[in-house]
Amino acid sequence: MNKTVFKSPEAKNKIIRAYDDAITNSSLNLKANVLKTTFGDTHFLEAGSQHQEIVILLHGASSNATSWLSDIAEYSKQYKVIAIDIIGEAGKSAETRPSYETIDFAEWLKEIFDSLNINKANIVGLSQGGWLSLRFATSYPELVDRLILLTPAGIIPTKTTFIIKAILYSLLGTTGRIRINRLVLGSQRVDNKIISFMDLIQTNFKARIEKEYIFSDDELSRLTMPVLFIGGEQDVIRSTQKIARRLQNIVTDFTIIVIPEMGHVLTGLVPRIFPFLNKTKH
């Protein structure tokens, strides 16, 4: 039986209330839906249903689909957007946490594709959502049109210095949370709403802490679709240069964008992503 991923029933309620408030306060025409899967109920947000081509958004760890709201507003002008609450994370989907060592996460996403009759889609994954995107794209490359990886996990290990600091800061309560956020954000300026969101999740959610799964060269060589990697030069969690170098050596159709003024929190990048998405298909 799965233990709850929230720190208490009230902690879960706080996150869900914030989730609902974020949607209410947005001006988006969103549909909220739930799908049954082998791994439990999966909740997702949908916009731009008048468009044919699909963009699927996969958020990072300790997050949920509302983290994409500003991006959904942009993507939905040209694409049908599906922002999924990843199972086992801080959203409205089941609290199931499949193993990173198996292809269960890919099978879960495949069930969503099948249920929604999706033959092919563009996928945008951020951090751990980038890892999930890679797990799916290497398992079912024929279902992915274009792959956009925003500072993805799974290419190189997380920096040991960051892990040590994060563990130490996690013992310091509120002060520690502030320090972790400061460390992750670096000198990057972000909206106060993002900082409040990060603090809410850290206070009320049990982050998943397990051994990382790093994809092999053989697995990454299955990425036959066009791949865009975007990283922040100031990322303290994983080296943007090392990720770019490894992918460049393996992936045939590969594009890199490095943003000097950004760290690990990559927001407002849709204008940079659209040219890649909208390239003429061969």
Question: Residues of each region from the PLM?
Answer:
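Hydrophobic, aromatic-rich cap/lid helix
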Residues: 191-218
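Alpha/beta-hydrolase fold catalytic core
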Residues: 1-53, 78, 119, 278-282
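Conserved HGGG/HGGXW glycine-rich cap/lid loop of the alpha/beta-hydrolase fold
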Residues: 40-91
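Flexible "cap/lid" loop of the alpha/beta hydrolase fold
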Residues: 131-139, 144-174
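Short beta-strand/loop motif that positions the catalytic acidic residue
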Residues: 223, 229-231
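Acidic catalytic loop of the alpha/beta-hydrolase fold
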Residues: 234-238, 264-265
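Active-site loop/oxyanion-hole signature of alpha/beta-hydrolase fold enzymes
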Residues: 83-124
